[in-house]
Structure formats: C-alpha cells, structure tokens
C-alpha cells in the first residue's frame, strides 16, 4: 500500500481516539473552552447520558464570524502562537484539536456571537473533507455548541459506551471537579430535561462553603482544615480533612495545578506521605487542593488528556506539598479540643439541642461534683432521646470533640461537637490562664434560660498552618547549610546540619517511651554481614525492635532488612545497617547510646539545603521539640547583630 495523506475526516477521527474517550470527554473539552472564553455562566444539557445530545451554552466572549471556519479546523487555536506561549500556558486548552475531533465523530453545530456583532452565526462541518458551512442564527453574546449522535459514524466506538446512567455519572463527577476549580462561575446541569445540579457562583466565604458542601458533602466540611503555604512563586492552598474525617474510599480527592484538574503521581505521592502517619491502610484522605506555580516551571503538554504535568523542580514541589499537609495535620492534632466558627452568629436554639427540660439554671458556683451531676443528667437525656444515633455511645457523644468547621447547613441532629459545646458552658475557666498560643475572639455565653433569644459566638482558631514560631521565619539559605531566620526584629543563623541531627535525635528518642513504627520496605534489602555478628543477632533484637528495625536472618552471612523506622528510611541502608550492627557488637551500647549514634549518622556534613527544605526542617523542629528546643540554642542558633550595618548608612 503506497504512502498517502489521510482524508481530513479520517485524520480527525484518529485524533478523536485520544481526545474523545466518552461523552464526559466532550463535556470537559467544551466546558474548558467556555472557561477560557471568560464565561461566568455555563449551562449543560445532556440527553441519554450524552450519546444523544450534549449542549454547552455560555456567556463568554464568543467567536467572530470570520474565525468560525478556523475554529472547526485541526490545530487552530487562539491561545498560543509561539513556542514561548507553549512553555508558559495559562489557558486550559491550547492544542486546537478538540472541536475538529468532536465534529468528526458527531453532528456538531457551533453557534456564536461577539459583542461587536449584531447577529450570530452558526457553523457546521460535514462530508469527507469536513467542509464548514455558515448560516445566520439568533443567539445572545456567547457560544452554544450542540453535539448530536456521538459516535454515530464509528460503530466500534459507540458499542463501548456504558449505560446512560453510567455515562451521566462520569459527566456529573467531571462537573464537580470543574465546579471546585472555578468557584466564581455558575454551572447548571440538566439531564433529559430535568435539572440535576445548580452550582451558583460563590463570592463570599459562606457561599464558598456552601458550594464545597454541595460537591463534597457536609461531612467533609465538618472535618475540613484550611491550609495555605507560600514560597516564592509556589503557592499551596485549599482544604484537607482531619484524620477523623477519613473516608472508606478516595471519592473526595481533588487537586488542581494552575486551575487545571490533575491526577498526577508525584502530587498524589506527596499527599499520601503527608497523611502516612495519620491514616491506616484502609482509610483515604479527603482534600481539595490548589497549587499555583509559575507557568514556566511546569509542562502541561505531557499527557493526551492533560491529567498529568511535569514539574521542572519536581523534588521541590513534592517536598513543599508534603510539608504543607504534614504540618497542617500535626498542628491540628496539637490544637485544644475547641469548636471553631468563622464569625457566624448562629441561632442558639438551632446550634445546641434543647436542654431546658432536664437542666435547671443555678446561680451558685459550679463545683466538680455539680458538673459531674450535670454531665450525668445530660447522658441520661441523650439515651432517652429517640433521634439519638444508635451507632454511638453516650460517652463518645459527650466526651469527644475535634477541631472542625461547624456550618449552618449541617444535619439537624445534634452532633458530638454540639453537645460538647453545651458541656463547655458548664465548665469554669481560669481567668489567669495565658498558655493558649492562638488568638481567640471574645466569647459571650448567655444563660441557659436566655438561650432561646440569644446567639453565641464560639472561639475562632486560626488556620491549621498558622502557629507561633519558636525559631522564626526562614528568609533564605546562606552557603547552602545555614538558614537565615527572622523572629521579630532579630535575625539569626541556624545550622541546618545540626538541626538535622536534633530532628533525628528527637524522633528516635521517643523509642524510650514507645516502640517506633516499623515502615516496611517496598523491596526487602539483602545485605552481607560478618558471621559472628549474624550469630548474635538475637541478642540485639530487643533494641532493634524498639527502634522499628525488622531484620530476618537469611543465612549465616547475610540478612534481609524488612522494615525500618521513618527517621532512617531515606538513608543508605546498605551501609547504615551493617555499621549499626557492628557498632552494637563491638561496644554493647545502651538504647540511648544507639539513638545518639544513629542520629549522628543521619546528619550530613556535605548536605546542601534549598529554601523549601530549610522551611520544612525548621517547621519539623518546632513541632517535635516545642519549648524544649531552647536547650540546643547554643549550638543551633547564632544571633546576627545588624546594628553596625544600619549605623554605617549615613545620609547627612
């Protein structure tokens, strides 16, 4: 068969194999075009799961009449013109393949009008050469695209479509992702003439929270922690669930890079690592995360469906995401068990369950016995309440409350948080207690008898990543091993290599109180060892187990490393484990000596630190040691006196 140029329709149908996988793929491409056109309202009409009709209507800028023909041509786009544009993409679409590919496997009609035009025009491509025909139409400013009879001319593709319900479910899930990425756009979805979803544009914080609840459910918002971290051109923000809000499946996991929805392996791995110590193997995190990065530092043209990206500094991005997730979870875990609200005054009667039938007001000071008696009455009343969930005991209901985001649209049933709030009213507070390290708004607690007519504002905690700094803010890295810190008006240098030692020592030192968690290696490591050491391995098992190190004897001269603790997981185990066993064999050390020895092995004299690594290291030190960190200040920190430098500036 001779080499020949393929007909336009056949070439487009081949391209459609990557672009148009199913009806949801069509919706994705067309809605993204609407977003790129600046639309603030997008209406989607679906019939029979998208196989019969997909109609996308927007109020964007529209397409001029003279460009309609080009719009249905392959590799025709208004979004890029040069290679520099391709390397700094800010739009969702850029290849110019979608409309041509879709029109080759369906009956597509494109109707559009710009502000400058008095009338709209409709374009339709058909025939072997995909010739475009134009005709006038009635249409407001914006664009409407009708995709009828998808895959009508490719029976092999059509028979692989699932049921209408399944295909529509994919479309619904897709629009959830888009609705989260652009909270400022109104999105309406109809199926077979019935309204299914209405996502209204969210401008205020309350509206944003309502959209989050509409997409992810109120249970997600109940356990949501708001995170935000910024470093140079890299910004990370969004919402993550606390461990208490973990799910049985990964159905609420949404991630975006520069507004583009992603299913990237590097990002997912960083998030999993951040949650590693917080969730069990059968639990899944829930999150809505946004990563904003300089377009020059990310390549989005690496996947047919644009679901994956390639970061120019992949390690930096990975560690940055891990640091934000891990830091937020650790700080949230250390917060007091106080319910938060975002300056919303909620009706007292709707916020707390009715208690007037079994709690009497008292003007006397509340003693411990009195509080215990009131708590007992509360439990008994709960047990007698028909609406109380049978799946939770009264002890659990009353005593447990986790930091969350209570909202007005939660279930009408009382929650653990609500009952705990009531119990908080019965607890007196020491006025001289100044140990809290977070800001709280003024709290006014009305008398129980006034509850029906009063409102209550409970303490408002800052975001989970906002914490009081013990060392200070990392400004930059000097000579690759020293971090420049600012704490108030004071500048300091921190030795990052010594900080690495302190971190490792702190992590390993917890072996005095509990067995360190052993993390299995993906591929068990076989290492050679002296016969004498191997024969005495059973004598060392106590210390090794306490440190989370799991070794199996293979034969008289080799071992298999099955698992190690997290602090040494990233080390060269091929060298570290034999050296550790040799050290134990030679001097028979105590657990404290082994911990000190291991901590020094983790310290790298030739290490080079980036700013992101320095920020992460400082944050981990603050979380690990807290106020006890001051004991290392002599070796860890050196003050910088900038007084002379300031005085040297003479402007007389």
Swiss-Prot record:
Pfam families, per the entry: DNA_mis_repair, HATPase_c_3, MutL_C
Domain of life: Bacteria
GO MF annotation list: ATP binding; ATP hydrolysis activity; ATP-dependent DNA damage sensor activity; mismatched DNA binding
Biological process, per Gene Ontology: mismatch repair
Gene3D superfamilies named in the record: 3.30.230.10, Histidine kinase-like ATPase, C-terminal domain (3.30.565.10), MutL, C-terminal domain, dimerisation subdomain (3.30.1540.20), MutL, C-terminal domain, regulatory subdomain (3.30.1370.100)
Functional summary from the UniProt entry: This protein is involved in the repair of mismatches in DNA. It is required for dam-dependent methyl-directed DNA mismatch repair. May act as a 'molecular matchmaker', a protein that promotes the formation of a stable complex between two or more DNA-binding proteins in an ATP-dependent manner without itself being part of a final effector complex.
Record family assignment: Belongs to the DNA mismatch repair MutL/HexB family.
Protein name, UniProt field: DNA mismatch repair protein MutL
């Amino acid at each position: 068969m001779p080499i020949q140029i393929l007909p336009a329709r056949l070439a487009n149908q081949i391209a459609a194999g990557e672009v148009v996988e199913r009806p949801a793929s069509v919706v994705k491409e067309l809605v993204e075009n609407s977003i790129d056109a600046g639309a603030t309202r997008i209406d989607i009409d679906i019939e029979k799961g998208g196989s019969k009709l997909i109609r996308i209507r927007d109020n964007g800028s529209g397409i001029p009449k003279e460009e309609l023909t080009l719009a249905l041509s392959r590799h025709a786009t208004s979004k890029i013109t040069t290679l520099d544009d391709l390397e700094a993409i800010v739009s969702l679409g850029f290849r110019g393949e979608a409309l041509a590919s879709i029109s080759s496997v369906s009956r597509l009609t494109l109707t559009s009008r710009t502000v400058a035009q008095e009338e709209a025009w409709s374009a339709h491509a058909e025939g072997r050469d995909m010739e475009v025909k134009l005709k006038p139409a009635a249409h407001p400013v914006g664009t409407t695209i009708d995709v009828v009879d998808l895959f009508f001319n490719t029976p092999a593709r059509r028979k692989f479509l699932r049921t209408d319900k399944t295909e529509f479910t994919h479309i619904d899930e897709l629009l959830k992702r888009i609705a989260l990425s652009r909270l400022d756009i109104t999105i309406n979805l109809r199926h077979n003439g019935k309204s299914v979803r209405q996502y209204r544009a969210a401008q205020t914080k309350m509206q944003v929270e309502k959209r989050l609840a509409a997409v992810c459910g109120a249970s997600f918002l109940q356990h949501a922690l708001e995170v935000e971290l910024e470093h140079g051109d890299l910004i990370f923000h969004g919402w993550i669930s606390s461990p208490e809000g973990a799910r049985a499946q990964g159905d609420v996991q949404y991630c975006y890079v520069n507004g583009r929805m992603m299913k990237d392996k590097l990002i997912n791995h960083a998030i999993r690592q951040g949650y590693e110590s917080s969730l069990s193997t059968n639990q899944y995190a829930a999150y809505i995360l946004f990563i904003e990065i300089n377009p020059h530092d990310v390549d989005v043209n690496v996947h047919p469906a644009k679901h994956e990206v390639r970061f120019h500094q992949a390690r930096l991005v990975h560690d940055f995401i891990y640091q934000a997730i891990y830091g937020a979870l650790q700080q949230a875990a250390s917060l007091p068990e106080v319910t938060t609200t975002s300056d919303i005054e909620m009706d007292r009667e709707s916020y707390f369950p009715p208690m007037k039938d079994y709690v009497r007001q008292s003007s006397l000071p509340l003693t411990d016995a009195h509080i215990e008696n009131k708590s007992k009455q509360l439990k008994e009343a709960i047990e007698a309440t028909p609406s109380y969930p049978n799946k939770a005991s009264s002890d659990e209901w009353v005593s447990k409350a986790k930091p969350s985001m209570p909202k007005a649209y939660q279930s009408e049933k009382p929650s653990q948080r609500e009952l705990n709030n009531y119990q908080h009213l019965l607890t007196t507070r020491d006025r001289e207690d100044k140990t809290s390290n977070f800001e709280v708004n003024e709290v006014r607690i009305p008398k129980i008898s006034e509850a029906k007519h009063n409102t209550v504002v409970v303490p408002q905690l800052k975001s989970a990543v906002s914490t009081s700094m013990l060392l200070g803010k990392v400004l930059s890295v000097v000579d690759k091993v020293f971090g420049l810190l600012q704490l108030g008006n004071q500048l300091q240098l921190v030795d990052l290599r010594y900080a690495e030692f302190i971190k490792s020592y702190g992590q390993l030192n917890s072996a005095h109180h509990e067995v360190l968690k052993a993390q299995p290696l993906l591929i068990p490591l076989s290492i050679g060892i002296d016969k004498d050491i191997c024969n005495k391995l059973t004598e060392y098992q106590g210390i090794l187990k306490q440190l989370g190190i799991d070794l199996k004897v293979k034969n008289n001269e080799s071992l298999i490393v099955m698992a190690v603790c997290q602090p040494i997981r990233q080390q060269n185990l091929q060298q570290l484990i034999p050296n550790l066993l040799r050290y134990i064999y030679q001097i028979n050390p105590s657990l404290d000596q082994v911990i000190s020895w291991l901590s020094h092995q983790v310290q790298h004299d030739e290490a080079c630190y980036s700013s992101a690594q320095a920020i992460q290291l400082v944050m981990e030190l603050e979380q690990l040691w807290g106020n006890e960190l001051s004991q290392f200040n002599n070796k860890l920190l050196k003050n910088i006196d900038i007084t002379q430098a300031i005085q040297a500036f003479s402007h007389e």
